[in-house]
Amino acid sequence: MKTVTVKDLVIGTGAPKIIVSLMAKDIARVKSEALAYREADFDILEWRVDHFADLSNVESVMAAAKILRETMPEKPLLFTFRSAKEGGEQAISTEAYIALNRAAIDSGLVDMIDLELFTGDDQVKETVAYAHAHDVKVVMSNHDFHKTPEAEEIIARLRKMQSFDADIPKIALMPQSTSDVLTLLTATLEMQEQYADRPIITMSMAKTGVISRLAGEVFGSAATFGAVKKASAPGQISVNDLRTVLTILHQA
Protein backbone atom coordinates (compact mmCIF):
# COMPACT_ATOMS: atom_id res chain seq x y z
CA MET A 1 0.00 0.00 0.00
CA LYS A 2 1.27 3.46 -0.82
CA THR A 3 1.52 5.96 1.98
CA VAL A 4 0.59 9.65 1.85
CA THR A 5 3.20 12.20 2.93
CA VAL A 6 2.12 15.68 3.99
CA LYS A 7 4.93 17.96 5.12
CA ASP A 8 7.13 15.50 7.06
CA LEU A 9 4.23 13.31 8.19
CA VAL A 10 3.88 9.86 6.61
CA ILE A 11 0.28 8.65 6.83
CA GLY A 12 -0.38 4.94 6.38
CA THR A 13 2.52 3.45 8.31
CA GLY A 14 3.13 2.90 12.01
CA ALA A 15 0.69 4.04 14.66
CA PRO A 16 -2.43 5.91 13.50
CA LYS A 17 -1.89 9.65 13.21
CA ILE A 18 -3.87 11.94 15.51
CA ILE A 19 -6.10 14.60 13.96
CA VAL A 20 -7.59 17.39 16.07
CA SER A 21 -10.40 19.69 15.00
CA LEU A 22 -10.34 23.42 15.67
CA MET A 23 -13.81 24.94 15.76
CA ALA A 24 -13.83 28.72 16.18
CA LYS A 25 -16.51 31.25 15.24
CA ASP A 26 -14.33 34.25 14.39
CA ILE A 27 -10.78 35.44 13.73
CA ALA A 28 -10.08 36.33 17.37
CA ARG A 29 -11.08 32.85 18.53
CA VAL A 30 -9.16 31.19 15.72
CA LYS A 31 -6.07 33.01 17.00
CA SER A 32 -6.60 32.15 20.68
CA GLU A 33 -7.51 28.53 19.95
CA ALA A 34 -4.49 28.14 17.68
CA LEU A 35 -2.19 29.32 20.46
CA ALA A 36 -3.77 26.82 22.86
CA TYR A 37 -3.60 23.98 20.34
CA ARG A 38 0.07 24.67 19.63
CA GLU A 39 1.01 23.01 22.93
CA ALA A 40 -1.01 19.84 22.29
CA ASP A 41 0.35 16.49 21.07
CA PHE A 42 -1.19 15.77 17.67
CA ASP A 43 -0.19 15.22 14.04
CA ILE A 44 -2.74 16.97 11.79
CA LEU A 45 -4.79 20.11 12.42
CA GLU A 46 -8.28 20.06 10.95
CA TRP A 47 -9.95 23.45 10.68
CA ARG A 48 -13.72 22.98 10.80
CA VAL A 49 -14.66 25.96 8.65
CA ASP A 50 -18.40 25.28 9.05
CA HIS A 51 -18.10 26.73 12.58
CA PHE A 52 -16.75 30.04 11.20
CA ALA A 53 -19.45 32.72 11.19
CA ASP A 54 -18.12 35.02 8.45
CA LEU A 55 -18.20 32.29 5.82
CA SER A 56 -19.47 34.49 2.99
CA ASN A 57 -16.34 36.66 3.22
CA VAL A 58 -13.62 34.62 1.51
CA GLU A 59 -10.94 37.13 2.55
CA SER A 60 -11.92 36.63 6.20
CA VAL A 61 -11.84 32.84 5.83
CA MET A 62 -8.37 32.94 4.28
CA ALA A 63 -7.13 35.41 6.90
CA ALA A 64 -8.10 32.83 9.52
CA ALA A 65 -6.35 30.09 7.54
CA LYS A 66 -3.23 32.28 7.42
CA ILE A 67 -3.27 32.60 11.21
CA LEU A 68 -3.41 28.82 11.58
CA ARG A 69 -0.62 28.33 9.07
CA GLU A 70 1.61 30.89 10.78
CA THR A 71 0.86 29.67 14.32
CA MET A 72 1.59 26.01 13.53
CA PRO A 73 3.71 26.04 10.36
CA GLU A 74 4.98 22.49 10.87
CA LYS A 75 1.53 20.87 11.19
CA PRO A 76 -0.35 19.65 8.12
CA LEU A 77 -3.53 21.74 7.80
CA LEU A 78 -6.76 20.01 6.74
CA PHE A 79 -9.47 22.42 5.53
CA THR A 80 -12.93 20.99 6.26
CA PHE A 81 -16.37 22.43 5.66
CA ARG A 82 -18.66 19.76 7.09
CA SER A 83 -22.10 20.06 5.52
CA ALA A 84 -25.22 20.18 7.68
CA LYS A 85 -26.49 16.95 6.11
CA GLU A 86 -23.35 15.15 7.32
CA GLY A 87 -23.34 16.63 10.82
CA GLY A 88 -21.88 20.10 10.24
CA GLU A 89 -22.90 23.50 11.56
CA GLN A 90 -24.07 25.25 8.38
CA ALA A 91 -25.90 24.41 5.18
CA ILE A 92 -24.57 25.97 1.97
CA SER A 93 -25.23 25.26 -1.69
CA THR A 94 -23.10 22.77 -3.60
CA GLU A 95 -21.79 25.65 -5.70
CA ALA A 96 -20.73 27.61 -2.62
CA TYR A 97 -19.16 24.48 -1.10
CA ILE A 98 -17.05 23.81 -4.19
CA ALA A 99 -16.10 27.49 -4.50
CA LEU A 100 -14.98 27.57 -0.86
CA ASN A 101 -12.79 24.51 -1.32
CA ARG A 102 -11.31 25.93 -4.52
CA ALA A 103 -10.50 29.17 -2.72
CA ALA A 104 -8.71 27.17 -0.02
CA ILE A 105 -6.76 25.28 -2.69
CA ASP A 106 -5.86 28.54 -4.47
CA SER A 107 -4.68 30.16 -1.22
CA GLY A 108 -1.63 27.95 -0.88
CA LEU A 109 -2.30 27.90 2.87
CA VAL A 110 -3.79 24.42 3.26
CA ASP A 111 -2.18 21.02 2.75
CA MET A 112 -5.37 18.97 2.51
CA ILE A 113 -9.07 19.50 1.92
CA ASP A 114 -11.98 17.34 3.07
CA LEU A 115 -14.37 16.61 0.21
CA GLU A 116 -17.66 14.84 0.89
CA LEU A 117 -18.28 11.85 -1.38
CA PHE A 118 -21.96 12.62 -1.90
CA THR A 119 -21.44 16.21 -3.09
CA GLY A 120 -22.04 15.07 -6.69
CA ASP A 121 -19.82 12.82 -8.79
CA ASP A 122 -18.79 15.40 -11.40
CA GLN A 123 -18.07 18.12 -8.85
CA VAL A 124 -16.06 15.69 -6.72
CA LYS A 125 -13.93 14.47 -9.63
CA GLU A 126 -13.27 18.01 -10.87
CA THR A 127 -12.33 19.25 -7.40
CA VAL A 128 -9.97 16.32 -6.79
CA ALA A 129 -8.21 17.07 -10.08
CA TYR A 130 -8.02 20.77 -9.19
CA ALA A 131 -6.58 20.00 -5.75
CA HIS A 132 -3.98 17.62 -7.12
CA ALA A 133 -2.94 20.16 -9.78
CA HIS A 134 -2.16 22.53 -6.89
CA ASP A 135 -0.38 19.88 -4.78
CA VAL A 136 -3.21 19.68 -2.24
CA LYS A 137 -4.22 16.26 -0.91
CA VAL A 138 -7.87 15.17 -0.64
CA VAL A 139 -9.50 13.37 2.27
CA MET A 140 -12.78 12.14 0.78
CA SER A 141 -15.40 11.57 3.43
CA ASN A 142 -18.80 10.20 4.33
CA HIS A 143 -20.54 10.52 7.70
CA ASP A 144 -23.74 8.98 9.02
CA PHE A 145 -24.70 10.16 12.50
CA HIS A 146 -27.73 7.85 12.63
CA LYS A 147 -26.76 4.34 11.59
CA THR A 148 -24.16 1.88 10.34
CA PRO A 149 -24.85 0.24 6.96
CA GLU A 150 -23.82 -3.31 6.07
CA ALA A 151 -20.11 -4.04 5.62
CA GLU A 152 -20.59 -4.41 1.85
CA GLU A 153 -21.98 -0.87 1.62
CA ILE A 154 -19.17 0.57 3.77
CA ILE A 155 -16.60 -1.07 1.49
CA ALA A 156 -18.45 0.11 -1.63
CA ARG A 157 -18.31 3.73 -0.43
CA LEU A 158 -14.61 3.52 0.41
CA ARG A 159 -13.86 1.91 -2.96
CA LYS A 160 -15.84 4.63 -4.73
CA MET A 161 -13.72 7.27 -2.98
CA GLN A 162 -10.61 5.42 -4.10
CA SER A 163 -11.91 5.26 -7.68
CA PHE A 164 -12.39 9.05 -7.53
CA ASP A 165 -8.68 9.34 -6.70
CA ALA A 166 -9.07 10.45 -3.09
CA ASP A 167 -5.69 10.43 -1.37
CA ILE A 168 -7.34 9.18 1.83
CA PRO A 169 -10.89 7.75 1.90
CA LYS A 170 -12.67 8.36 5.23
CA ILE A 171 -15.92 7.09 6.71
CA ALA A 172 -17.49 7.74 10.14
CA LEU A 173 -20.64 5.91 11.22
CA MET A 174 -22.94 5.83 14.24
CA PRO A 175 -23.43 2.41 15.83
CA GLN A 176 -26.82 1.37 17.15
CA SER A 177 -25.26 -1.66 18.83
CA THR A 178 -21.89 -3.22 19.59
CA SER A 179 -22.32 -5.48 16.57
CA ASP A 180 -22.40 -2.33 14.41
CA VAL A 181 -18.90 -1.55 15.69
CA LEU A 182 -17.79 -5.02 14.61
CA THR A 183 -19.36 -4.39 11.20
CA LEU A 184 -17.28 -1.22 10.80
CA LEU A 185 -14.09 -2.98 11.93
CA THR A 186 -14.77 -5.96 9.64
CA ALA A 187 -15.33 -3.65 6.68
CA THR A 188 -12.16 -1.72 7.52
CA LEU A 189 -10.08 -4.89 7.65
CA GLU A 190 -11.53 -6.26 4.42
CA MET A 191 -11.01 -2.95 2.63
CA GLN A 192 -7.46 -2.66 3.90
CA GLU A 193 -6.52 -6.26 3.04
CA GLN A 194 -8.32 -6.71 -0.28
CA TYR A 195 -8.97 -3.38 -2.00
CA ALA A 196 -7.10 -0.41 -0.55
CA ASP A 197 -3.99 0.85 -2.33
CA ARG A 198 -3.80 3.95 -0.11
CA PRO A 199 -4.44 4.80 3.56
CA ILE A 200 -8.04 4.85 4.80
CA ILE A 201 -9.62 6.38 7.90
CA THR A 202 -12.64 4.75 9.54
CA MET A 203 -14.41 5.14 12.83
CA SER A 204 -17.47 4.07 14.74
CA MET A 205 -18.78 6.97 16.81
CA ALA A 206 -20.06 7.54 20.34
CA LYS A 207 -18.96 5.68 23.47
CA THR A 208 -20.00 2.37 21.90
CA GLY A 209 -17.55 2.84 19.05
CA VAL A 210 -14.55 4.16 20.97
CA ILE A 211 -12.53 0.96 20.42
CA SER A 212 -12.47 1.78 16.69
CA ARG A 213 -10.69 5.06 17.46
CA LEU A 214 -7.94 3.19 19.29
CA ALA A 215 -7.44 0.01 17.25
CA GLY A 216 -6.71 1.51 13.83
CA GLU A 217 -3.28 -0.07 13.57
CA VAL A 218 -4.82 -3.52 14.10
CA PHE A 219 -7.72 -3.20 11.63
CA GLY A 220 -6.33 -0.78 9.05
CA SER A 221 -7.36 2.79 9.87
CA ALA A 222 -4.47 5.21 9.35
CA ALA A 223 -5.65 8.11 11.51
CA THR A 224 -7.97 8.91 14.38
CA PHE A 225 -9.53 12.04 15.85
CA GLY A 226 -8.82 13.28 19.36
CA ALA A 227 -10.00 16.24 21.40
CA VAL A 228 -7.81 19.09 22.64
CA LYS A 229 -10.76 20.85 24.21
CA LYS A 230 -14.29 20.23 22.95
CA ALA A 231 -14.85 17.01 20.98
CA SER A 232 -15.89 17.57 17.36
CA ALA A 233 -17.78 14.26 17.25
CA PRO A 234 -19.27 11.90 19.84
CA GLY A 235 -16.79 9.41 21.29
CA GLN A 236 -13.58 11.38 20.87
CA ILE A 237 -11.09 11.15 23.73
CA SER A 238 -8.35 13.55 24.77
CA VAL A 239 -5.21 13.65 22.65
CA ASN A 240 -2.97 12.77 25.59
CA ASP A 241 -4.95 9.64 26.46
CA LEU A 242 -5.21 8.79 22.78
CA ARG A 243 -1.45 9.04 22.19
CA THR A 244 -0.80 6.84 25.24
CA VAL A 245 -3.10 4.07 24.02
CA LEU A 246 -1.92 4.25 20.39
CA THR A 247 1.70 4.00 21.56
CA ILE A 248 0.95 1.01 23.81
CA LEU A 249 -0.77 -0.82 20.95
CA HIS A 250 2.03 0.10 18.52
CA GLN A 251 4.78 -1.17 20.82
CA ALA A 252 3.02 -4.33 22.01
UniProtKB/Swiss-Prot annotation:
Pfam families: DHquinase_I. It catalyses: 3-dehydroquinate = 3-dehydroshikimate + H2O. Gene3D superfamilies: Aldolase class I (3.20.20.70). CDD domains: DHQase_I. One of its GO terms (molecular function) is 3-dehydroquinate dehydratase activity. Pathway: Metabolic intermediate biosynthesis; chorismate biosynthesis; chorismate from D-erythrose 4-phosphate and phosphoenolpyruvate: step 3/7. InterPro entries: 3-dehydroquinate_DH_AS (IPR018508), Aldolase_TIM (IPR013785), DHquinase_I (IPR001381), Type-I_3-dehydroquinase (IPR050146). Coiled coil: none annotated. GO terms for biological process: 3,4-dihydroxybenzoate biosynthetic process; amino acid biosynthetic process; aromatic amino acid family biosynthetic process; chorismate biosynthetic process. Keywords: Amino-acid biosynthesis, Aromatic amino acid biosynthesis, Lyase, Schiff base. 3-dehydroquinate binds at residues 21, 46-48, 82, 213, 232, 236. The active site is at 143 (proton donor/acceptor), 170 (schiff-base intermediate with substrate). Its EC number is 4.2.1.10. Involved in the third step of the chorismate pathway, which leads to the biosynthesis of aromatic amino acids. Catalyzes the cis-dehydration of 3-dehydroquinate (DHQ) and introduces the first double bond of the aromatic ring to yield 3-dehydroshikimate. PANTHER family: 3-DEHYDROQUINATE DEHYDRATASE (PTHR43699:SF1). Belongs to the type-I 3-dehydroquinase family. Homodimer. This is 3-dehydroquinate dehydratase. It comes from Escherichia coli (strain SE11). The lineage of its organism: Bacteria, Pseudomonadati, Pseudomonadota, Gammaproteobacteria, Enterobacterales.
